[in-house]
């Protein structure tokens, strides 16, 4: 058994699609739009075959909180410490908030954590 995909609500579907394509080499399918339900989504497929569905419905405006129950972050493995550093530096230079890192965690992971445009936490690790 494997996870088929995970999904996240977003406010700006096109901006978030561009984010995952530009920084994480994702490839989006064609836009799905259900007019009756005011719902739109893209499935973004990454090099590993993992898929993320980004979804918009009406006005989802509640900002994420780091202290709520539910999903905490999504993590991307980039293959090396150097690539963690490079991608973190690129995201920081482009104006994204670096929440922490790059650093080695107490349990031995090398990672950084950034916020996307909508405040979702993205972990970048080896």
From Swiss-Prot:
Residues of the VOC domain: 2-126
Record's InterPro entries?
Fosfomycin_Res_Enzymes (IPR051332), Glyas_Bleomycin-R_OHBP_Dase (IPR029068), Glyas_Fos-R_dOase_dom (IPR004360), VOC (IPR037523)
Q: What sections of the sequence does the record tag as coiled-coil?
A: none
Q: Which SUPFAM superfamilies match?
A: Glyoxalase/Bleomycin resistance protein/Dihydroxybiphenyl dioxygenase
Protein name, per record: Uncharacterized protein YyaH
């Amino acid at each position: 058994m494997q996870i088929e995909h995970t999904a996240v609500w977003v406010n700006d579907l096109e901006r978030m699609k561009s984010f995952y394509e530009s920084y994480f080499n994702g490839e989006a399918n064609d836009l799905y739009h259900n007019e009756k339900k005011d719902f739109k989504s893209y499935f973004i497929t990454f090099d590993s075959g993992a898929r993320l569905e980004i979804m918009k419905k009406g006005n989802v405006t509640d900002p994420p909180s780091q202290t709520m129950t539910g999903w905490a972050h999504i993590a991307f493995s980039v293959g090396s410490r150097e690539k963690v550093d490079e991608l973190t530096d690129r995201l920081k230079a482009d104006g994204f908030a670096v929440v922490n890192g790059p650093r080695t965690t107490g349990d031995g992971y090398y990672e950084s954590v950034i916020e996307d445009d909508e405040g979702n936490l993205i972990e970048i690790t080896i």
